[in-house]
Every structure is written in C-alpha cells, then in structure tokens.
Amino acid sequence: MTRRLILLRHGQTHYNASFRMQGQLDTELSELGVRQAHAVGRVLAPRRPWTILSSDLRRARDTATALAAEVGLEVHTDPRLRETHLGSWQGMSHSEVDEKWPDARQQWRSRPRWSPPEGESRIDVAQRTRAVVDELVEQSPEWNEHPAVLVAHGGAIAALTAALLELRVEQYPMFNGLGNACWVQLSAHPRAQGSPGGAPEPEVPPVTDTARGLLWRLDQWNVGITPPVGEQ
C-alpha cells in the first residue's frame, strides 16, 4: 500500500513580501496570500485528501482552512509543525541580520546543526516534524493513495522532507526555496525485507514501529499554481 503525503507551504505574508524573518511570530496572510490560499485549495481539492493537519500559526492555519472548505474537512493543528524558531532574528529584516551577524545566515543555511542565537537548528525542526508524520502513520491504517495534507512553513517543510528521505546531514541544505502556497509530495512504500545491513542510522530516524517499515520517496518538489496567483 502506498501512502501519499502533501506538504503545503502557507500563502504569502507581509513579512515574506518585505524579506523579514518570521520564525514563530504569528503573522497573517497578506491580501495576495489569502488569494493564494483559496487558489491552492481549489487546485488540491480534486486529490481528495482524507485529513488536513496544520501548524497552529495563523498563516498556516488560514491556508489550511481554505483547503478544508473545498473538501469538507476539519483542520487539526499541531504546534510541532511550526516554523523554525529563529530566536534573536525574529522580526528582523534580512539586511538587519546580516549587519549584526555577518555571514550568519549563510552558516544557518549550509549547516543543519547550526542555530541562530536562542533559536533552533534544522535538525531540531526535522525531529519534531518527523514525529508528527510517524505518529500519523502509526494511527492511520486506512491511509492510502488519497493524500494526507500537512500545512506548514518553508523551513519546516524542507527539514521534514530531508528527514523523511533519510538524508545525511550534509545533504539537508539541498532543499530550500519553497514558494508561498507551493507544495511537496512524497509517497511511502513498504521497505524491502532482508535488505543488506550496515547502512548508517538516519540523522533523524523514525520514531514508531510502523514508520520504520516504510521508505519515503520524493514525487514532487516546489509545485505551484500555473500561472502564479497575481499573474493571472
């Protein structure tokens, strides 16, 4: 049985538009972001998701609610799907961070164990978000090719994708640049029995027995509406 998972990033916020570091600040969708949320809801509805989980931050929750209205589902929230906590950077513009901490943003993007002052690393985020998916696998034997949709944030989705694919830590930075109201699709397949031993333990291993028996594959990355909302 194949399980499909869609990871959807929230619509645009004013912080996105002005290149400010949001992290776990509870920002709202911009007018464009609201339009993106409704548009992506209409696009994903024909895939008939069976459940919708969302970060409890407003920008993700409102995006999830737009999809839920199209398919007649409730939105279940989980704070573990929040964006990376950016510590002292939260609320600052990119240029303000670069002025106060030269080269720090590059360190943050290229070193998954590195964290901003008083913030989280990408590995921290991968651990808490992976647990959400593994628990969903464990609790949902009915999960089939109709997708579960998780609505979250760019950094959180990048970290979760790398964790589900069991990448080495130095490979985590390959996932970045997920657009607003764009999504990732992965599929989980039974892991082959009797595979050769000696493989290294994943940086962020599965946390439930059922999840340990699955191998996730990347089907789509950074897929969005065509043409983008605002250009239609």
What is the predicted function of each stretch?
Residues 45-48, 136-147:
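Glycine-rich phosphate-binding loop signature in dinucleotide/nucleotide-binding domains
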Residues 1-6, 51:
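Extreme N-terminal starter segment of soluble prokaryotic enzymes
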Residues 39-105:
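Phosphate-coordination/substrate-recognition cap region in phosphate-metabolizing enzymes
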Residues 1-3, 69, 84-96, 138, ...:
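Acidic, low-complexity terminal tails and accessory targeting/binding regions
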Residues 6, 76-78, 219:
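General small-molecule cofactor/ligand-binding pocket signal
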Residues 11, 154:
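Active-site metal-binding loops of divalent metal-dependent hydrolases
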Residues 12-67, 113-132:
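Loop-to-helix element that buttresses phosphate recognition and phosphoryl-transfer chemistry
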Residues 5, 143-152:
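Generic beta-sheet signal
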